[in-house]
Amino acid sequence: MLGSVLKTSRLDMLLSSSERFLSTTQFLTREWNLDDPKQKALYKLYRAERVTPSVRGVDLLKSPDLNKGMAFSLQERQYLGIHGLLPPAFMTEEQQAYRVISKLRKQPNDLARYIQLDALQDRNEKLFYRVLCDNLKELMPIVYTPTVGLACQQFGFIYRNPKGVYITINDNSVSKIYQILRFLLNFLENFSKKFFSSNWKFNEIKAIVVTDGERILGLGDLGAYGIGIPVGKLALYVALAGIQPRWCLPVLIDVGTDNQELLDDPFYIGLRRNRVTGPEYDTLLDNFMKACRKKYGQNVLIQFEDFGNKNAYRLLERYRDDYCMFNDDIQGTASVVVAGLLACTRVTKKKMSESSYVFLGAGGAALGIAEMVVLQMQNEGLSKEDACSKIYLMDVDG
């Protein structure tokens, strides 16, 4: 997402009453007095973004990273070969965002809102993030938990367009996985123009979220339906952290599923086989990590998400010293919870080491939190043994 997002109230503060009625084209082509602080601020935020698209015409309107919907000016429509392919009216991004959020609020349920937002992301990525950033509190539960869990359960039924990259057990070699991630420079027949083609549409990847779908939220093994988790998590990377969408890569490692309901589901989009385990599984993960490092460099961030308990800790220990990676369920959740507990100490006036902790559940998240709580109590002077004595984990058997 390029540029900054202005809230209406802030825009009203900067615009004079006459400027509010200018069209987008008039507004952007007006003469600016850069000595005026207000006009300079507006110029920086709303100056025209000069991008030469790699496609034109209908293909441009089908490219979510380039499509601006009805915000294309007349000159842009004529130059890019889309004049006549859009309705004749012109709408600013703000107007389009208002239309989207108004329609979302009239949907009958959260899953319908998720489907509509998913379609918008496929159609106009910049508008999708504009709507999301302007309505974070309202839309975060739609884009991610809890609605994404329901969407994953019904992913085969609501599936529209592919998002992310699927690495299967049949791609179990560094060269095959690298081929999927590749970004090749090709030439047109007359060698007068260059264009890029690839399995994945962007080359400069800085953040990867990967899951094998074995333990999706609290819903269990959802197999290939788990792709909704990396997609949703990276949408939050963009909306909350300002990461460029083109730097993000959602990945689903498909090694099958042990969920018989999915294997019997006629709409299931993944491999119809039981999960691969053992050395073959480990080799696939090793090859995936090597291919990512080979393609995107040592510093590419790889976030492990919703792996099963038996693999989550093991893979974290296996890769943490050699790759820029972390497990969100173990480390990400734990860091947030411990930060909250540390904030509570300001109210209770007690150190964390002066309290005992009971966990309802003994999954990856609970164990990760417990380990980080123990580390914090050790930092406060307790021995590891004394710190562990203050931790109680209640598993499914009580």
Where are these regions (language model features)?
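Conduit-forming functional cores of very large proteins
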Residues: 358-359
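Short acidic-hydrophobic catalytic motif
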Residues: 393
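N-terminal chloroplast transit peptides
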Residues: 1-14
